[in-house]
Amino acid sequence: MKTFSAKPHEVKRDWFVVDASDKVLGRLAAEVARRLRGKHKAIYTPHVDTGDFIVVVNVEKLRVTGNKALDKKYYRHTGYPGGIYETNFTKLQQRFPERVLEKAVKGMLPKGPLGYAMLKKLKCYAGGEHPHSAQQPQVLEI
């Protein structure tokens, strides 16, 4: 019996919608990253993007445990000398709610072109509405 290897044009991708209300950031991000990679499928192949599309709504209602709301730091750099900026979880969630989950999931995906393609299948929205109803996403309980 030969080892199965998925071909990119043979992969069937489904759409799922996840409600992030009152979910813990890391636990949600880990499951979303697993589904973006396609590890939940029997046809998973490491060098092929076999994952599904994930739409996450109510991202502004994500939570973290312990003191991480104030202690968790996010860094970015402008590219100029001395141009490093630091913010904490609470401030970033108030200003850009989607970015918190996107950064958490991005760190759990492979680096390189394959990981970037997987990250493009993640759609995050702060409110309860999303523009992907034409794809008829299935509700995914995490």
From Swiss-Prot:
Print the organism lineage.
Bacteria, Pseudomonadati, Pseudomonadota, Betaproteobacteria, Rhodocyclales
Q: Which Gene3D superfamilies match?
A: Ribosomal protein L13 (3.90.1180.10)
GO biological process, alphabetically ordered: negative regulation of translation; translation
- Report the leader peptide range: none
Keywords, ordered alphabetically: Ribonucleoprotein, Ribosomal protein
Gene name in the database record: rplM
Gene Ontology molecular-function annotations: mRNA binding; structural constituent of ribosome
Q: What GO terms fall under cellular component here?
A: cytosolic large ribosomal subunit
Q: Which domain of life is it from?
A: Bacteria
The record's note on quaternary structure and interaction partners says: Part of the 50S ribosomal subunit.
Q: What name goes with this protein?
A: Large ribosomal subunit protein uL13
What does it do? This protein is one of the early assembly proteins of the 50S ribosomal subunit, although it is not seen to bind rRNA by itself. It is important during the early stages of 50S assembly.
Q: Which InterPro entries match?
A: Ribosomal_uL13, Ribosomal_uL13_bac-type, Ribosomal_uL13_sf
Record SUPFAM superfamilies = Ribosomal protein L13
Pfam hit, one: Ribosomal_L13
Q: What is the similarity comment for this entry?
A: Belongs to the universal ribosomal protein uL13 family.
